[in-house]
Amino acid sequence: MSHRGWAAAALVISMAPALAAGSDVLTQARSAAGGAAWERTPALAAQGRITASGLSGTWSRADDLQRGRWAVRQDLGVFRSANGDDGQRRWRQDASGGVHALNGAYSLRAAITEAWLTRRGWLRADAASASLSPIAQRSDEGHDFDVLRATPRGGEPVELWFDARSHLLARSVRELPISLQTVRYADYRRVGGLQLPFRIETRDSSSSDVETVQVDGWRIERHAGAPAYAAPTPPDDTLLQAETTVPLEIDGMVVVQARVNGRAFDFILDTGGHNILTPDAARSLGLQPVGAGASGGAGEGSLSEQYVRVEQLQIGDASMRDQHFYVLPLQYGTVERGERVPLAGILGLEIFERFFVRLDYPAKTMTLRKLGHTEARIAGTPVPIRFDDDMPLLDGRIDGVPGVIALDTGNSGTTVVQGVWARRHGLAERLKQGIETVSYGAGGASPNWASRLQSLEIGGHVIERPLARYAEDRAGAFSSRTEAANIGTDILANFVLHIDYRAGVIGFERRPGLSAPPFNRAGLRAYKESAESFRVAVVTPDSPAARAGVSRDDRIIAVDGVPAARLSGRQLFDKLIQPVGSELHVTLKRGAEERQATLRLAEMLP
């Protein structure tokens, strides 16, 4: 299920020549929707039923037509969630009950547009000061539409589709940071002189999910009270007397042990993720997931998604009760660990919403302190963080150019520079001259080009010549139009991080002396496709791998005489970055043919 306030998939059709002034179409829309009755209506409330992600439940919406405040709440049984704007902040309640602000630069602009839509700005005089594009005609599914693009002052653009016959709003289309979203409105009925939709269908281009709301009833509210738009109170579901410190395993991935319903499992710690169990882990606990949603991440693909609740989650002495988890079949290469038990999933946003977190990369420890229990000390350089979704964003610089940087403890490797931002600032052409490679995330493969940046700066701390990957993904986490980069372990390993989501700050305490891993010295990129083999995804021309005759789609079944079944992806990575001149002996399988190859490692990216 989409974790956004409005969701949908957009239909993109080329714009036809302008046919009329936008104001003419809006005059028709105003008359069709109820005309002056809107001026006499201060607020609206609705209740209904929602179906989404294979689940069904209750839905409600409150709209302040004067100030643009709003709130949507839904209860799908296995979890509740909500989104809204109380006039002071745009807020979100995720499926765990945790609440955080959406206050990034994009979200502030989007909130202006959401408030304009809530006020029905297109029905107001002068479109409530929004700028309007010329009208175009479009046809879809046997219907004709008058379409215009409205941009509220200081807000994000929104495309409005009016039915050419009824003149009522049929769709709204908006561009999100990594997707397009559309909301379809249908089954209009008259309520107190207003025409209101009783069927609202929403989609998102990043997901196959469809959310359908069947409104049971709208009612006119004569007083828009503040509680209707207030964020819910987060659940008091954590127990921790003072603080607890636990060891971390940091070898690219940041891994922490936790107990679920009393059983110990190892999880990836991911500021960019949610609490997730793999299907195998859920089965081992005797849990019965429900629903049928879809989710994505890095890469352009998506994964099936289900939902479950666990009685208790424990990390050290910290305990959380009645916790929501997503159940996702994470990529095999993400969770496998060679001869060790696979990872059970991910711990993410839900942990950081509930605790002050100290991540000591050099010491490989994590300390949790309950938020609000005692004053947490932010050591190092305090850097403000904001949110456009669920990952912390901060201001930084890449090669001296300012940009929004996502802090992602789930990124086990190098910095990823986003293509849209790089093109906007004239860096793309140089970055694409790097070495072709590929990375893998929840959404599958992401083609990258590796090179060295001149510098990366966070909170006044400058990292010189860090390795970076340039991505031009068309979908997924690395297709953002608002972020400059995503930083992971290679950068964060230089710091002790003091993370306080409630205060909106992360302290960066630099620890000198880190020697970052070198770039792959074999000239091949391979991923663990099954227990028995690695599949070669990329071979760099004129590299040790190319000279040894390794080809794309070859299967590596042994390395230095050790069967692939006994090796993890990280262990293979470590072998590929051994000192220059080292020899690496691999057993390859191409079809039914098996052969030996020797790679003499060389510096590929000094």
Task: Put a short name on every predicted segment.
Residues 57-61, 79-83, 156-160, 179-187, ...:
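A structural detector for short beta-strand units
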Residues 24-98, 133:
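N-terminal mature ectodomain segment of secretory-pathway/periplasmic proteins
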Residues 53, 153, 161, 186-606:
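Pepsin/retropepsin-fold aspartyl endopeptidases
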